[in-house]
Amino acid sequence: GCGDHFFLASLQKAMADLGIAPYETAVISGIGCSSRLPYYMKTYAMQTIHGRAAAIATGAKVANPYLTIWQVSGDGDGLAIGGNHFIHCLRRNVDINIILLNNRIYGLTKGQYSPTSPRGFVSKSSPYGTVEDPFRPAELAFGARGNFFGRAVATDNQGVMELMKAGQRHKGTSVCE
């Protein structure tokens, strides 16, 4: 599964702990398992087209620099069709928080391999196993000149919440995987 409910609970708690007002916040998602998450937040929210969440989040921050921006994408949405927007957002160091839900598969399409699926991974779209090596999100982020990357396990609510709080305190783009 995608673990969205764990991230939702952690994000809500992190925002409350940080004292971030919902009316000063936007949660922006792409398409996939993460796409419905903004609807459960009492903030400004937008579900964008596939792969464009980082571009929309960047635009929202540029248009209103006082907004706290949380951009939520899965590994397929954020690193495949949205990969170019991901790396340029990091390169520009826009002050947004990217939550990357990496389950190493396109979960919503029920089994298509993603950019983070391991080599040899057998799925409906790769019945003989994938032939590519996977992206390593941390290496991709730092290679694009990102300067905040953290990783937590979805079921560790406290760890995820602390990671999100650290990402929000960081000035510039943060990636919380």
State where each predicted segment sits.
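Conserved thiamine diphosphate
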Residues: Y66, S114-H170
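Generic beta-sheet signal
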Residues: T25-V27, L67-I69, G172-C176
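Conserved active-site and cofactor/substrate-binding residues in soluble primary-metabolism enzymes
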Residues: G3-S10, P22, G51, A55, ...
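Glycine-rich, charge-decorated loop segments at or immediately adjacent to ligand/cofactor-binding or catalytic sites
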Residues: G107-Y113
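Short catalytic-loop micro-motif centered on adjacent basic/acidic residues
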Residues: Q71-S73, F148-V153, V175
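Active-site diphosphate/adenylate-binding microenvironment
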Residues: G1-I49
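Thiamine diphosphate
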Residues: S29-G107, G159-E162
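Generic secondary-structure signature for well-ordered alpha-helical cores
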Residues: D4-F7, K13-I20, V62-P65, R91-V94, ...
